[in-house]
Amino acid sequence: GPGCPVCVTDVPEVDEAIVLATQGVRIATYGDMVKVPGTVRSLADAQAEGGRVHVVYSIAQAVELARETDDEVVFFASGFETTAVATAAVALDAPPANLSILSAHKYVPAAMEVVAQHPESRIDGFIAAGHAAVVTGWALFEPFAARTGKPVVVAGFEPLDILAAVLKLVELIAAGEASVFNA
């Protein structure tokens, strides 16, 4: 769901945004990120204490904020491949000089690799998010499947999509196939 990227944002990244917000920098970030706890407090706490935190729905709004002020604006970017594209597009398209990006973006295959390689992992296969695969292409998961010996099925979030993915994943596991399938 929409809160997933904030769930995997590292505490030091949140702490860095909090420090900036309390030093006069305007932090622009997604609403869910404001409530994520850092080591001692959240961005919401920092805002209540005078920190400069702005909730935005896209990086485009952070760009607008930067154009409306001479203050330093930092977009605290979180998310996976789907939100990284918009962040990268702004970074490559002559953003305002007073706009910086604090990237907390995550890369799905790297996260899967950590889970697959964990010594206590008992996972036999993975269902990968279809919306991320739309950005990267589902073939991105082929090296992972080959390296780990675990199948990957790409699916959407609708109940039937997930059920179809589970069925295909069970079939691949039963057949001993470490391949990638787009459900």
What are these regions (language model features)?
Residues 102, 122-182:
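A conserved active-site cap/scaffold subdomain adjacent to cofactor or substrate pockets
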Residues 2-4, 80, 131, 157:
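Gly/Ser/Thr-rich helix-start
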Residues 54-55, 74, 100, 152-155:
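Short hydrophobic alpha-helical runs that function as membrane-insertion/retention elements
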Residues 13-16, 67-73, 114-120, 142-143, ...:
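Short, surface-exposed amphipathic charged segments that create phosphate/polyanion-binding patches used
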Residues 76, 80-140:
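Phosphate/pyrophosphate-binding betaalpha-module
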